[in-house]
């Protein structure tokens, strides 16, 4: 049985020719000829079974044989916002693996301790498309341009929002546990007063406390912020908490930025119905 060949054609239903880069791969690498079948994906939730109708030089024309709408593999909107590492290969690795695992949106943050302030998103787009084809995903994750941390959190004010960090002085709940079930209030030690930061986190957690499973609320937006190698600054963490983000950890291990990002995506993915 021949392996199905997948090609990314954003306007597959309205076009009849493969984009230049995909055509080159089809003709020069796979050596497709007239009559050969292939699968097209528009990155918007639909696959198309198609056949090569004509080839000419660098051009590869096709005819759609069948339209195959896909059902979402998860119901929420999974969004990772992360500060890029100094070595771009590591963020490129993250973009590839996160796409394979499954998520919806990648944002790049410019933070106080960021080691990189410029990112070429077209290359990340190519990596995401390649991973989307390899893992047979029907939806292409959105890749956003880098944005200042303060501006970013001011623009994201709805849905479940989390900031992962390592500061002991700001109380944290575990991200995976929080995603699996509605968080319970932080434990109170008798005779002890909460600091201002603890009060804010406690209030946020108590507002969503319930014995009902978290999964009861389907199709909701999840956003996790992951900082640079030097972590977010304490001021950035407090700013996010003030804006309604829940302070979380990603477990007991201290993780590299790209590993933390992938862990966050996997936790969001595993929390889906």
Model-based region annotation:
Residues 1-70, 183, 202-205, 210, ...:
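N-terminal positively charged helical leader segments and presequences
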Residues 62, 140-144, 247:
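Generic structural signal for residues in well-ordered beta-strands
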Residues 71-166:
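RNA substrate-binding interface of SAM-dependent RNA methyltransferases
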Residues 162-180, 221-239, 243-249:
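Active-site/ligand-binding-proximal alpha/beta "capping" segment
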Residues 189-191, 215-217:
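Glycine-biased, low-complexity coil/linker segments
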């Amino acid at each position: 049985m021949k392996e199905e060949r997948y090609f990314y054609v954003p306007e597959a239903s309205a076009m009849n020719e493969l984009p230049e880069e995909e055509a080159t791969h089809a003709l020069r690498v796979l050596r497709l000829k007239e009559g050969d079948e292939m699968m097209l994906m528009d990155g918007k939730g639909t696959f198309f079974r198609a056949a090569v109708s004509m080839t000419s030089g660098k051009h590869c024309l096709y005819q759609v044989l069948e339209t195959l709408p896909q059902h979402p593999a998860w119901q929420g909107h999974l969004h990772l916002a992360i500060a890029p590492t100094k070595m771009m290969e590591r963020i490129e690795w993250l973009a590839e693996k996160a796409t394979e695992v499954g998520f919806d949106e990648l944002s790049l943050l410019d933070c106080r301790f960021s080691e990189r302030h410029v990112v070429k998103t077209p290359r990340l787009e190519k990596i995401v498309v390649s991973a989307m084809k390899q893992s047979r995903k029907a939806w292409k994750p959105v890749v956003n341009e880098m944005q200042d941390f303060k501006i970013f959190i001011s623009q994201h004010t709805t849905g479940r929002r989390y900031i992962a960090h390592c500061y002991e002085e700001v109380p944290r709940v575990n991200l995976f546990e929080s995603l699996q079930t509605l968080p319970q209030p932080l434990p109170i030690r008798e005779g002890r007063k909460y600091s201002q930061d603890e009060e804010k986190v406690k209030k946020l957690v108590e507002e969503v406390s319930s014995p009902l499973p978290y999964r009861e609320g389907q199709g909701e937006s999840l956003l996790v912020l992951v900082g640079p190698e030097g972590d977010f600054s304490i001021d950035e963490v407090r700013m996010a908490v003030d804006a309604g983000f829940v302070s979380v950890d990603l477990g007991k291990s201290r993780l590299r930025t790209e590993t933390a990002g992938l862990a966050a995506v996997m936790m969001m993915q595993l929390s889906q119905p």
